[in-house]
Design a protein with these regions (language model features):
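Sec-dependent bacterial lipoprotein signal peptides
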Residues: 1-21
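Bacterial lipoprotein signal-peptidase II cleavage site
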Residues: 6, 19-36
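N-terminal low-complexity, Pro/Thr/Ser-rich intrinsically disordered segments
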Residues: 33-68
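Short, polar/charged alpha-helical segment
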Residues: 55-66, 76-98
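Short amphipathic alpha-helical segments
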Residues: 69-71, 172, 296-300
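Extracytoplasmic ligand-binding site segments that recognize negatively charged/polar headgroups
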Residues: 72-88, 100-116, 122-259
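A ligand-binding cleft/hinge motif common to bilobed small-molecule-binding domains
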Residues: 134-139, 256, 262-282
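Extracytoplasmic/periplasmic substrate-recognition and gating elements
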Residues: 277-306
Length: 306
């Protein structure tokens, strides 16, 4: 985990270069949207809280949350890591708190940008769910808050000052429509013309944790390591030159339609795709690679301006 944190903090420039050179740049900036919320008054007690003790008891914290009346979340697709059930469970347990779901397909970077754009308004995200690369380089945007189970979280899985902590993980994998493309044994298979315009990372490597780690998977299989990201860059350049790489954002819709027929993504997402597509008569397969077991936690953080 320490090594991954160092990698995340030190290699964004290289991965950004990959995004522009291999995937092509996109001039659209989602953070440029004008502020749409109403100005709100900050609750000083809540803003200064660094742990449950500052509220009193859990009942006191719940009462404060119910008084506010709403929770703004972002980048929580219902089929991602079972977030749909988590959200429904929260609603049942705390019916007095309205959940406002924003941009479920936002990248980690777009989450933080939304907090900046909507700062001081009721449209700002209250909490973030972030890949390590963005979490570890964006701590100035987070509140220092240590959750109730803080002491049980390993030191290597949290920020020492309480800016963020890891909560769930998966293994990076490659998934594909086996009915259409047959078997895939290696990443070199994806250079075949039959995969024209259909191979996708789940997001942009410089912005999204899934895409960043998809890049690391390819880099590892291409002979690279934590200190050498060039082989991955070379691989994706070849994939682009072959006409097989697409920069379309991966969603249920693009997978259902076949627009993204091969996807680098976490195993828990692939399992969700497989289940949904099976109901539609599509055989979606996915695999991990023994020589490239890329694992990275996602992290929870609180918007310091929430």
């Amino acid at each position: 985990m320490i090594s991954l944190r160092k990698l995340a903090a030190g290699s964004l420039a290289a991965v950004l270069a990959f995004s522009m050179a291999a995937c092509g740049s996109d001039s659209t900036d989602s953070s440029a949207d004008s502020t749409s919320g109403k100005v709100v008054k900050v609750d000083e007690k809540s803003a200064k809280a660094t742990s449950l003790a500052d509220f009193g008891t859990m009942d006191d914290l719940v009462a404060a949350a119910e008084k506010e009346g709403q929770l703004n979340v972002i980048a929580l697709p219902h089929n991602w890591s079972n977030y749909g059930e988590v959200i429904n469970g929260f609603k049942k347990k705390y019916p007095k708190i309205k959940i406002n779901e924003q941009n479920p397909n936002a990248s980690s970077k777009e989450e933080v940008d939304a907090g900046k754009t909507n700062k001081g308004t009721d449209a700002a995200p209250d909490v973030y769910d972030l890949g390590l690369a963005v979490a570890s380089t964006s701590t100035d945007n987070f509140a220092s808050y240590k959750v109730q189970a803080w002491d049980k979280i390993p030191d290597t899985a949290k920020d020492a000052d309480g800016a963020y902590y890891a909560d769930y993980t998966g293994i990076m994998s490659v998934g594909w429509n086996a009915d259409k493309y047959g078997d895939i044994s290696s990443l070199d298979d994806l250079l075949d013309p039959k995969f024209a315009g259909t191979v996708a990372l789940n997001g942009k490597p410089a912005e999204a944790g899934a895409a960043f780690n998809g890049y690391l998977l390819a880099n590892q299989l291409a002979g690279g390591d934590i200190n050498n990201l060039q082989p991955g860059l070379d691989y994706f350049k070849k994939l682009k030159e072959a006409g097989n790489l697409t920069t379309v954002d991966v969603t249920n819709g693009t997978i259902d339609s076949g627009q993204t027929g091969v996807v680098f993504d976490w195993t828990y997402n692939q399992a969700s795709y497989k289940k949904e597509l099976k109901d539609k008569g599509v055989n979606w397969k996915y695999k991990t690679f023994p020589k490239a077991q890329v694992v990275s936690y996602y992290n929870q953080a609180i918007n310091k301006d929430a």
